């Protein structure tokens, strides 16, 4: 099978998936408020596509860590992006947890990168584990809910075999959801989990390990600007309905 997707292409696919998901989150609640019939199948389909975004971004963060010549600079950029994105993310109406203090997905990606970097500075296993658990705890606050993002990023970076890296990483990424399903099973939850894992594994099966074009700045601008544009659209519609 020819592997034609490089790292830059993966990021672009993840950005597109994220945009589709966020458009669904903004558009369908507005349609409901305007008493317009909302086709649930379309909203659900858009959200399923959107499920691809976070695992791919997590995978790319791990790849960036493994191949970066200046990890501290990489961390500063991602941390700055997380801070810049706080306001547009909050304007989207997705404020939970500690609200404007953190509250966006990039924080979880940043914490996953921190877990990798700072745990690798330690020699004692207990210190490594403590750092990873601390970053995981902070990610719960950042996302306003339980997520295994930090575990997934760590697994993507540390598992040696390329195939097991993807499988182990996406399972670690969804470890909390798997644990919840084990104790509180739901068919919808299982379908959502399976769709996320299978879609990620399908797309990354075409990954060739190459860096590709330098689009770092595209992602750093895209994330806050697309949130800002969608939040302004949402606010304008809500004002129109008043």
Predicted regions and their residues:
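Alpha-helical transmembrane segments and their immediate juxtamembrane cytosolic regions
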Residues: 1-242
